[in-house]
């Protein structure tokens, strides 16, 4: 798998992650994750239907992906797939907020694995 391809695209993988993955809720964001045997961690950012405005959705998506690229190397022992469900109250989230959320989330996931 190429390093730049960090997206989860398969419908079956997405459904399985929603059903069998671990769940964490942070204010305005639901996070599903599951450890995999792949060589790289992957991510999917999705939104409920009430989240209007493609420009805002795409901006949130770009910010999450960039922060994830920066921090997924912390998961060096085991790779995981993540789904972030972002709600409208987090529409104006900035890069630094996402950075702290992802850093705390990855530390939490590493502790849960051990």
Swiss-Prot record:
**Keyword Transferase among record annotations:** no
Give the source's domain of life in one word.
Bacteria
Top-level EC class as recorded in UniProt:
hydrolase
Any one GO biological process: tRNA 5'-leader removal
Q: Which reaction does it catalyse?
A: Endonucleolytic cleavage of RNA, removing 5'-extranucleotides from tRNA precursor
Keywords, ordered alphabetically: Endonuclease, Hydrolase, Nuclease, RNA-binding, tRNA processing
Enzyme Commission number(s): 3.1.26.5
Q: Which GO terms describe its molecular function?
A: 3'-tRNA processing endoribonuclease activity; ribonuclease P activity; tRNA binding
- Signal sequence, start to end: none
Say which family it is in. Answer: Belongs to the RnpA family.
**NCBIfam families membership:** rnpA
UniProt-listed PANTHER family: RIBONUCLEASE P PROTEIN COMPONENT
The entry describes its oligomerization and partners as:
Consists of a catalytic RNA component (M1 or rnpB) and a protein subunit.
Q: Which HAMAP family match?
A: RNase_P
What name goes with this protein?
A: Ribonuclease P protein component
The organism encoding this protein is Borrelia duttonii (strain Ly)
Taxonomic lineage per UniProt? Bacteria, Pseudomonadati, Spirochaetota, Spirochaetia, Spirochaetales
């Amino acid at each position: 798998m190429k390093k730049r391809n960090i997206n989860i695209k398969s419908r079956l993988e997405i459904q399985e992650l929603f059903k069998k993955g671990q769940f964490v809720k942070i204010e305005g964001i639901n996070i599903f994750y599951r450890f995999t045997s792949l060589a790289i961690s992957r991510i999917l950012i999705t939104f409920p239907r009430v989240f209007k405005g493609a420009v805002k959705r795409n901006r949130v998506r770009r910010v999450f992906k960039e922060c994830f690229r920066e921090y997924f190397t912390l998961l060096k022992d085991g790779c995981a797939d993540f789904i972030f469900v972002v709600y409208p109250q987090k529409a104006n989230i900035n890069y630094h907020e996402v950075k702290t959320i992802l850093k705390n989330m990855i530390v939490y996931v590493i502790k849960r694995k051990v």
